[in-house]
Every structure is written in structure tokens, then in C-alpha cells.
Amino acid sequence: MAKIMIQGTASSVGKSLIVAALCRIFKQDGYSVCPFKSQNMSLNSYITLDGKEMGRAQVLQAYATGLEPEVYMNPILLKPTSDRKCQIIVNGKVYGNSTAMGYHNLKLKFKDMLKEHFNKLEEEFDIVVMEGAGSPAEINLRDRDIVNMGMAELVDAPVLLVGDIDKGGVFASLAGTMLLLKDGEKERVKGTIINKFRGDVEILKPGLDMLEDIVHIPCLGVVPYTRLQLEDEDGAVEFNKKAYAPIDIAVIKMPHISNFTDLDALKSEEDVSIRFITSKEEFKEPDLLIIPGSKNTIEDLLYLRQCGLEESIKEYSKDGKIIGICGGYQVLGSKIKDPHNVETDLGEIDGLNLLDMKTIFEKEKITTRVSAKLLNEEIENTVYGYEIHMGISEYSENVKPLFKIYNKNGEKVGYFDGAINEKGNVMGTYIHGVFDGVVFREKIINELRVKKGLKKKKSQIYEHMREKELDKLADIVRQSLDMEKIYSIIGMK
């Protein structure tokens, strides 16, 4: 089996998409391929078919290979709950909560498990494309590293180092990273990649020659800056407002926002513009307000209260349409109770009181794949998605459920999810990915179109669009990199 590891000079340099591109290229060339990232830190997660939780970046990479996402592609997921604490997910299940130092002391405990996962991949696939995290030059963390050079050494993988030229300082970041690596680690790096370049590559060539003289490894290519409709995992990317798009969707960007990949399918609609708001001054008059998921619902509810957005949301709810997803659904209720101090020690807190329901946090985390029917619709419809939450919500008789769940992790069930008020303009659901399918997305956007005097439209199938975008990404990267050299590095050609 062949393997290659993509590391970067920093976070957000484009490692995840370079890995996705290589996965698709190798697949196009006839090889069986699997992505692997030993440890991921993200608030964007996904639930596999067997009800386990993993990072979204490896989900996209799995799609690039044509595989169903599985937790062995991302055995450890860290979900920050505050600046210094995180929830640790191991093999898809909650391992516990820890401080940064506590986890640093734990890491070596997982080494054997990671090696075992990788050994199985070696037996099953022709090529494994690995991804590092942050930078391999974090010298204060090197002694217990299990995701960058520590992982590369564990499985004897060659490394390609990616730098982001769009931020500036790419030569210094690449040379500086190499400077801080140990001699054995430097030998493992077989090439550099310049990512997100805008302009004429000819202007860059003298710098590339000088860089090669300094670091003594070749630059394998320059990848142009390209806008693709593929999800971004590292942060709540600021969506570019479409000047020509008549449908304005505002999303509350809360401090602990999670699973904002729920917005990606909406972003693919040509006449829809999405913008994040963090203050009442930015609120304006959107056609739809979305309150997204949160890793700390209570603290984010307090944030809405403190910054004045609670007042704006309540005023908007008189005539505007609001959709809450997961944590955003919970804040719409009348009360949130936390008897086990899952999030804070407040015990309970009043919600926005826009839906007559209350949420009670429990110790056990719910992680399930679900299939649901949108209620009160004449058309045959199915919505697919997944749930990731720590609480259950109970609503009164005068609140109608939004969905009926009929399949949970592959088993037949029959229970209600979500709620919608009597007026029909405020609703919420626990289902992540609710907009990915055509049915619910098309229904909501067409309602907004009609309200603005616009014609209804058919929504495109998001999965088809994603496949086209992955092919486009692969074409760009194939044309930009020395693939013959990369195949030589992994011993395939």
C-alpha cells in the first residue's frame, strides 16, 4: 500500500481540500483510496450510518473517494466547548471532556489505536491520503504529537508541505516550518505546494527557485485560488454576498456556532445570498433568519441576550420566518434546563419563548442518522439527516411537530421531531443536513420567492453539484501539481 501525508504551515492553508483533490485524482486513475486524519478539531461533525461521530472534512474526502464516511477515517475528534476545554470523541463516541493540558497528557494513550486503524487501511486500500493538523512546527507540542510528524513517523509516510500564499508570507512560512523541524522530519518532507495563488505564476518562479535553494526540496506546484461550492470546515467562512441574489438569508453567528455546514446546500441556490450577523445593527430585514447549531447553547443564548440580538429576533418573529437547527432550535423554546451541569452551572435559563417547548439536557449524547417525513405536506417527501445533541425537547399541545422520524440508524421507528408555531413562521428541528435534500430546501426557498413576488424554482440535487465540484477541484489540482513526481514519491509509478 502507498501513503502520502499532507501537512501545512498553519491552519486554514487548504490541507483538507488538497487531500480531497488527491483522493479524487487517485480514484480517477483507478486506485482504491481512503482518507485518514488521526485527530481533528472542529465543531462541524457528521454522524455515520452506524451512529458514530466524525469530522466533516474527512466526510468530504470520503465522498471524493466514493466511500461511505466511517470513523476509522477520523478516529479522534476534538470539539471545543470553550477556549480551554473540549469534548473528546474517540472512535465515534464521547470519551470525555478535558482541558487542553489534560488532553495533551492523554494523547500518547491513543497511539496504538491509531496504528491499528492505519494497519487495517494498509491491508484494504491501494493508497491512503493522510492529513495533518495545524502546523508540524508547533515545537511545544512535538513530544506528544499524534497528528503531524508523530503520525507520519508512526506509519513511515512521506510528507508534502502546503503553504497559503493568499495570506502573504508564504516563503517565510514554508522556510520557517522547515527550519523548526528535526533533521529526520526534514528528510520526510518530499515537496512543497503553494496554495491559493492569484495572478501570473511567471512572477512567482524566481521566488520558487530561491525557496528550493533554501529548503532543498522541490516545489511540486502552484494551485490557483478558486471559489468552489465545497464545505469549509475550519471556521464559519464569511459568505460572499451575491449582489444579484434577491433572497436574503441571515444567520446568527454565535460564539459557539457548530455544524454551519448545514448552510452549504442553501449557498448553492443561485438566487440566495447568505450573510452572518453578530449584532442588532447587522440584522436589517432578511427574508429568512437561521439560528444554527451550538456547542454551548446556554452560553450562546446569553450572548444573544447581552448583544441585543434577542430583542431583534423577537421583533422579527412577528412577521419574519425563523428556522432553528439543533441548539438554535433549543433557544427558541421557553426554557432550557441543565440539571447535570452539562454546559454550565446555571441550572436553568429562559429561552426566547418563540416556541412553546422546553429542553432538558441529559448526560448521554444522542448521535443518530435519521430519515423523516415533513408533516402536513400533500407531496410525498423524505428528509435525510442526523442528530447530535445532549438534550431532549418537550412541547405543549398547541405546538405542532415539524417532522416524523421513521428510521433511526437503520431501524424502523416512529416519533416526532421539531416544532412549528401556530402561525407557521417560526420552526425548529434537531436534524442536521435538513437542507441537503431537495424537499425541505425547495419548499422553504419557494415560500420566500413567492412572498417576494418571484417565480418558484426547482432546486438542484446537492449531491450532484458536490460531485461536479469535486471533479472540478481534482482537475485544477491535477493541472497544477507534478502528479508524476507525486506518484514517484509514493512508489506507484
From Swiss-Prot:
Residue ranges of every copy of the GATase cobBQ-type domain listed in the record: 246-440
Molecular function via GO: ABC-type vitamin B12 transporter activity; catalytic activity
Keywords: Cobalamin biosynthesis, Glutamine amidotransferase
InterPro entries named in the record: Class_I_gatase-like (IPR029062), CobQ/CobB/MinD/ParA_Nub-bd_dom (IPR002586), CobQ_GATase1 (IPR033949), CobQ_N (IPR047045), CobQ_synth (IPR004459), GATase_3 (IPR011698), P-loop_NTPase (IPR027417)
Matching CDD domains: CobQ_N (cd05389), GATase1_CobQ (cd01750)
UniProt xrefs under NCBIfam families: cobQ, PRK00784.1
Family: Belongs to the CobB/CobQ family. CobQ subfamily.
Purpose: Catalyzes amidations at positions B, D, E, and G on adenosylcobyrinic A,C-diamide. NH(2) groups are provided by glutamine, and one molecule of ATP is hydrogenolyzed for each amidation.
HAMAP family hit by this protein: CobQ (MF_00028)
Protein name, as recorded: Cobyric acid synthase
Record lineage: Bacteria, Bacillati, Bacillota, Clostridia, Eubacteriales
